[in-house]
């Protein structure tokens, strides 16, 4: 059984590293530190140019919850259009109601705009109060997969729920495990759940290439080092590939 390995990235440098490591698919984001937000149109275009594997763009206009306003939805529709224009292979979406259910109306609107693209429903499902009803709605909308940690903080802790989802959906929806997946636990997660897809960042950092700079002014939170650049690790991705063979 071939296992698909999706790598989430938020810069073009990481795209090259993910491909070198053996990734099967890219989830294209900005701001992975915030859980992943929508990448820019320029990033989408350059990713499409340089990728030799499928690229799915995250469609998430802001950090925080998955209860989106009409303005948010308008942005999401425009961003899906941008992903199409960039000739990406798919998008990653997720929308909830105030009560913690799938927002079927918004999901159907997004799916209509995404016609012709592959669609992953992201970890918004991990904040649903009734995950099996959520799966029914996601399948009915026409999504091809979900990304989930089994409603837990990480996929290893959520293996029982993930396995239940796999059984429930059968061949109607692919279940992809993500959150905390590493070379150490990937094989165990696959064996215990029956999944055929895993998701990870394989992140590391590299130092800035700047040789002179003033370092007293922070561009964001003071606890974030502006001169340490997050990038995908070729070695970490390769290690996961080797672990699941």
Swiss-Prot record:
Record key words, sorted: Cytoplasm
- Residues forming coiled coils: none
- Output the InterPro entries linked to this UniProt entry: CutC-like, CutC-like_dom_sf
Query: Which Pfam families does this UniProt record tie to the protein?
Result: CutC
| Any single Gene Ontology cellular-component annotation | cytoplasm
Where is this protein found?
Answer: Cytoplasm
Query: GO terms for molecular function, please?
Result: copper ion binding
Protein family per UniProt: Belongs to the CutC family.
By what name is this protein known? PF03932 family protein CutC
- Source organism per entry reads Photobacterium profundum (strain SS9)
Q: Which gene encodes it?
A: cutC
């Amino acid at each position: 059984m071939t296992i698909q390995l999706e790598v989430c990235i938020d810069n073009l440098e990481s795209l090259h590293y993910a491909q070198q490591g053996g990734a099967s698919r890219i989830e294209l984001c900005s701001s992975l530190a915030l859980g992943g937000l929508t990448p820019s149109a320029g990033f989408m275009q350059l990713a499409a140019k340089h990728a030799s594997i499928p690229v799915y763009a995250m469609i998430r206009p802001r950090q925080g919850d998955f209860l989106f306003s009409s303005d948010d939805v308008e942005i999401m529709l425009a961003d899906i259009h941008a992903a199409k224009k960039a000739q990406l292979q798919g998008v990653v979406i997720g929308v909830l109601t105030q009560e913690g259910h799938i927002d079927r109306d918004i999901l159907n609107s997004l799916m209509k705009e995404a016609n012709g693209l592959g669609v992953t429903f992201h970890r918004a499902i991990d904040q649903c109060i009734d995950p099996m009803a959520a799966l029914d709605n996601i399948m009915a909308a026409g999504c091809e997969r979900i990304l989930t940690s089994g409603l837990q903080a990480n996929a290893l802790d959520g293996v029982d729920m993930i396995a239940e989802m796999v059984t429930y959906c059968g061949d109607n929806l692919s279940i992809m495990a993500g959150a905390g997946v590493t070379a150490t636990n990937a094989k165990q997660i696959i064996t215990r759940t029956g999944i055929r897809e895993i998701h990870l960042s394989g992140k590391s950092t590299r130092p800035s290439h700047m040789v002179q700079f003033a370092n007293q002014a922070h561009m964001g939170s003071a606890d974030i080092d502006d001169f340490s650049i997050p990038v995908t690790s070729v070695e970490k991705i390769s290690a996961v590939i080797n672990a699941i063979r």
